[in-house]
Amino acid sequence: GTQGHKAMAKTFVISDTHFNHANILEFKDYLGKPCREFDNVDQMNEAMMDNWASVVSPEDTVIHCGDVLFGMDKVDWLTANFAKLPGKKRLVIGNHDNVKHLAPFFKDIQLWIDMPGFIFTHTPLHESTLAEAHRFKEPKLNVHGHIHTNPSPEGPYKCVCVEQINYT
């Protein structure tokens, strides 16, 4: 008989989920619109977790470009919720991340992840740093977070903040 073939594992990238960060619902973008249009923090958490679970399979890899969550009881929340999300999770550390709390929930934690054609960072790399990388190796797309609703710098940058990827 014919053998079923396993789907290729995929890599997904997301950043700045800010799980449990109630105050982020008050933040406005540069046009004065709310950055995140959710009624409350539970609704925001649920939406992001549902979206994640709807596209990521257990064999997939998820690169999180930092700023995972806020608030108290981090480890309890991570254990009850984040740990159940599918995928092999890798973290590029963000400016709000506590490695001690997050380490048990990620396969690895890096300051950046360098892969063929891509460099994953939390904040966008300075253009001179990116130019330097291009001189020695093949050109890379800098996949980053941190800037939320703001546009990426000109050039080979891609923002994967949840606000810019439909929270998925």
Could you tell me what each predicted segment is?
Residues 7-8, 137:
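Short, well-ordered loop/turn elements at secondary-structure boundaries
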Residues 9-15, 19-114:
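Core catalytic region of metal-dependent phosphoesterases/phosphodiesterases
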Residues 101-168:
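Conserved beta-sheet core of the metallophosphoesterase superfamily
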